[in-house]
Amino acid sequence: MKQKALYYHEKGYNCSFVILKAGTEKYGIDLPEEAEQSCCAVSSGFGVGSICCALVGAVLLFGLLFSEEKAKTLRMQLFVLFHDKYESLNCCAISAHRQDCIEVIGDIAILTEELIEKNK
C-alpha cells in the first residue's frame, strides 16, 4: 500500500486521496470518481493546518472495510500509533520541519495496512 500511496502522491494527488486510493486498490474496492472530487476539499489539514488529512484518508478506508464500531476502534488505534511517532495529529505541527510529507504518507500507509491485516 505504501508504494501505491507514494506513487499517487508523486502524480500530484493530495494526502487523503492517496491513502484512500492505494487502500481501495489493495483491497479490491471500487472507488467512484466522486471520491477524488470529495478528497479535493480534504487536504492541508482541512486548509487550516488541522488534522493530517492522510489520516483522514485512512479513516475513510476503515469505514469502507469494516463495521462502524470496528472502524472507530481502528481509527483510535491509528491515531495513537501515529501520535506516538510524530507527537501530533496536526498537519501544521507535523509538516513544520519537513519539505514534504512523503515519509508521513508512507508511515500512514504502513500503519493502516498493518491494522487492516490484523483485523480482517
Regions found by a protein language model. Name each.
Residues M1-Y27:
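Active-site-proximal helix-loop elements at catalytic-domain edges
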Residues C15, C52, C91:
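Short cysteine clusters
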Residues L20-C39, H83-S88:
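Acidic-glycine-rich active-site phosphate/pyrophosphate-binding loop
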Residues Y27-Q37, G63-Q77:
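Phosphate-handling active-site elements
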Residues L74-K120:
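C-terminal binding/interaction regions
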